[in-house]
Amino acid sequence: MKKRKILLISLLTMILAITAMGSSAFFNAEDTAHNVITSGSVKIAVVETMLDGTEVKDFPAEGITGVMPGSTVSKIVRIQNTGSAEAWIRVRVGTTVHSGEDAELDARVVGFSVEEPWVDGGDGYYYYTKAVPAGGETEELFREVRFDPNMGNEYQNCTAYITVEAEAVQTANNPIPAEGTVRDVAGWPGAEGVD
């Protein structure tokens, strides 16, 4: 009888334990939330076109040949915002001229006029004074390139290279500072505190 009592007590304890575990399972709940946060992108592309009569077409990759002193060549430069975020934009324009023998010549014989709303930042860059929306593009940086009418014989068979390098930074949480200009916004590559 003692064994039966112990067996009965053990059996009741097990039943109570199993019941308690089952009840505990009914009062527990679990859930997982997956949150996806995607940042915007700042991407740009230099767009170079030219006016051929009344038709605007892509500027030829091989350039223009047969340019004479005093010539003006159509070269329209804009910057397109291909990213998903609004951006501030600046550009640097480099000009080099190489003779037919590949000697570097004075590049001041090549000129262009920067259009509004672009401004010379005085630091080697031209700044676009308006924010450019995603998918949008700037107005023309310049529309034509001029060659000095006083170019000498050393410029025969020369090649002029005009390089346009563009940079962009986000406008979100990056306004033009009070009493500042677009040149003063944070994040420009090479600026203090920017890697």
Enumerate the language-model features and the residues they cover.
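Surface-exposed, hydrophilic segments of mature proteins
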Residues: L8-S10, T19, F26-D195
